[in-house]
Amino acid sequence: MFSFLCLVELALPMSKTLVDSYGRRIRKLRVSLTDQCNLRCHYCMPVDAIFLEQSSYLSCQEYGEIIGELIALGLEEVRLTGGEPLLRRNFTEIVRAIGQLKLKKIGLTTNGIVLDRHLDTLGENNVLDLNVSLDSLNAKTFSEITHRNCLNTILRNLELASRQGFKIKLNTVVMREINDREIFDLIEYAKRWEMEIRFLEIMRIGYACRHQEKTFISAQELLAKIQQKYSLKPIQSALDATAFRYSTSCGGIIGFIASESQPFCGHCSRWRLSVDGTLRACLLKNEGINIRNFSSLERQHVYQQLLGMKPYLRPPEVSHAMHQIGG
């Protein structure tokens, strides 16, 4: 059944590419496979988080159809996210299906806890770009952030993936008086295992809003601190990149994702598909359109509609939780 919005959009011509009125071409899609997670990071979700019924999840076939339609409109890259995507029961089936599509790149964002169980599947389907969350190398601090005691498991799996040739970026949410004293240890760890590390500003999203003001550290403050120890050389990045990156005098590569202090909305090329089928033009917008039960024709009109829903300037804080939208 057509939604009212779709009926309105039927009067508009459909473009063969996803380019909005600001000239931003949508070429990347974040795809959530589950809202469940085996960590409880305090900036992401409460300890007693309530998750969706799995009957509301998109099926493997639905993922394939939606992503295939977007590829025909110019989509080039997909990143599988969660929650924790490796907890999806039919993860292998979904990865194999997406791996058969004509994408330039498929990546995965994970916390690494069960990564070792899936490395063969990932390698076989050319999912070689891994973003792994790692907020601390200290077991006590890690436990305080995540409410879990599994740091050694994650480090072991990271090192296994590195030895097997996966391209790994570590994502560290830096928080004042929590883990900000560890940035040099993290840089050295990443360099030792030939991983890039990216320092993220804590964002005003959902559950993090209650902590954000007290713990926020800007990317510029971190950069100045790091420059006291290392010489840094800028690395040129694509216009729509989320991070600004540097090579360091210690031989490593670091990046900064300054979503709060230096938002990159004006060049953003990403949409997000939640596990329940809600397609969003922006991480920081509550609004989205659930396309799960739409026909292919209906979805085509939604894609055009969504181009007009992507803001050019960064919206204020949003209420939905990060794990629910594939952050």
Swiss-Prot record:
Group of enzyme by EC: lyase
Catalytic activity: GTP + AH2 + S-adenosyl-L-methionine = (8S)-3',8-cyclo-7,8-dihydroguanosine 5'-triphosphate + 5'-deoxyadenosine + L-methionine + A + H(+)
Binding site for GTP: R30, R79, T109, K169, R270, W271, R272
Cofactor note: Binds 2 [4Fe-4S] clusters. Binds 1 [4Fe-4S] cluster coordinated with 3 cysteines and an exchangeable S-adenosyl-L-methionine and 1 [4Fe-4S] cluster coordinated with 3 cysteines and the GTP-derived substrate.
Annotated [4Fe-4S] cluster 2 binding sites: C265, C268, C282
Cofactors, names only: [4Fe-4S] cluster
Gene Ontology BP terms: Mo-molybdopterin cofactor biosynthetic process
Gene Ontology MF terms in the entry: 4 iron, 4 sulfur cluster binding; cyclic pyranopterin monophosphate synthase activity; GTP 3',8'-cyclase activity; GTP binding; metal ion binding; S-adenosyl-L-methionine binding
Membrane-spanning intervals of the chain: none
Lineage: Bacteria, Bacillati, Cyanobacteriota, Cyanophyceae, Synechococcales
Record's keyword annotation contains S-adenosyl-L-methionine: yes
Family the UniProt entry places it in: Belongs to the radical SAM superfamily. MoaA family.
Assembly mode: Monomer and homodimer.
Gene3D superfamilies reported for this sequence: Aldolase class I
UniProt KW keywords: 4Fe-4S, GTP-binding, Iron, Iron-sulfur, Lyase, Metal-binding, Molybdenum cofactor biosynthesis, Nucleotide-binding, S-adenosyl-L-methionine
NCBIfam families: moaA
Protein name according to UniProt: GTP 3',8-cyclase
Function: Catalyzes the cyclization of GTP to (8S)-3',8-cyclo-7,8-dihydroguanosine 5'-triphosphate.
UniProt-annotated binding residues for S-adenosyl-L-methionine: Y43, G83, S133, M203
Pathway named in the protein's UniProt entry: Cofactor biosynthesis; molybdopterin biosynthesis
